[in-house]
């Protein structure tokens, strides 16, 4: 396992649309493990592959309910709306209020290539939306109001 340096705002990979994963190889499994190690080392609740410099459609999320790994995730259903404060490991020292769907259903593949569908609400729904935005080259600051800079 390895902890990678998180890519920060200004790096062009964060503006790219990440490439779909066509085959789940041992390298993809290793990527998921390294992403989780990195997320935990940085005390994050989610991480997308582009945040460690890899243009692949993979995310890891853990909001305190256990690690979720998703390959080629997509949001298939949304409902409601709520505004809350977000931050991002790739935009250190910055927070802002972002309006997101209150509930989402996310579909993707697990590390075994099995399709999984996850209904989510609250922080988990927000984390999924935030990380999937990363896969589409979108940073939270592009959607945020009341942006505040905090000490690093």
Swiss-Prot record:
UniProt keyword annotations, A-Z: Hydrolase, Iron, Metal-binding, Protein biosynthesis
Active site positions: 131
GO molecular function: metal ion binding; peptide deformylase activity
Cross-referenced InterPro entries: Peptide_deformylase, Peptide_deformylase_sf
Catalysed reaction equations from the record: N-terminal N-formyl-L-methionyl-[peptide] + H2O = N-terminal L-methionyl-[peptide] + formate
Signal sequence segment: none
Positions that bind Fe cation: 88, 130, 134
Cofactor binding comment, as recorded: Binds 1 Fe(2+) ion.
Cofactor: Fe(2+)
EC number: 3.5.1.88
Enzyme class, UniProt record, top EC level: hydrolase
Origin: domain of life: Bacteria
Stored SUPFAM superfamilies: Peptide deformylase
Cited Pfam families: Pep_deformylase (PF01327)
One record GO biological process: translation
Disulfide topology: none
General function of this protein: Removes the formyl group from the N-terminal Met of newly synthesized proteins. Requires at least a dipeptide for an efficient rate of reaction. N-terminal L-methionine is a prerequisite for activity but the enzyme has broad specificity at other positions.
Annotated HAMAP family: Pep_deformylase (MF_00163)
Similarity-based family: Belongs to the polypeptide deformylase family.
Name of the molecule in the record: Peptide deformylase
């Amino acid at each position: 396992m390895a902890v990678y340096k998180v890519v920060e705002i200004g790096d062009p990979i964060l503006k790219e649309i990440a490439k779909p994963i066509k085959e789940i190889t041992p390298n993809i499994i290793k990527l998921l493990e390294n992403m989780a190690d990195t997320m935990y080392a940085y005390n994050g609740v989610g991480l997308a592959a582009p945040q460690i410099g890899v243009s692949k459609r993979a995310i890891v999320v853990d909001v305190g309910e256990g690690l979720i790994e998703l390959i080629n995730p997509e949001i298939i259903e949304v409902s409601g709306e709520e505004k809350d404060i977000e931050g991002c490991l790739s935009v250190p020292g910055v927070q802002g209020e972002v309006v997101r769907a209150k509930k989402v259903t996310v579909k993707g593949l697990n590390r075994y290539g099995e399709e999984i569908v996850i209904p989510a609400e609250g922080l988990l729904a927000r984390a999924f939306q935030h990380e999937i935005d990363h896969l589409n080259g979108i940073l939270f600051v592009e959607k945020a109001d009341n942006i505040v800079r905090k000490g690093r």
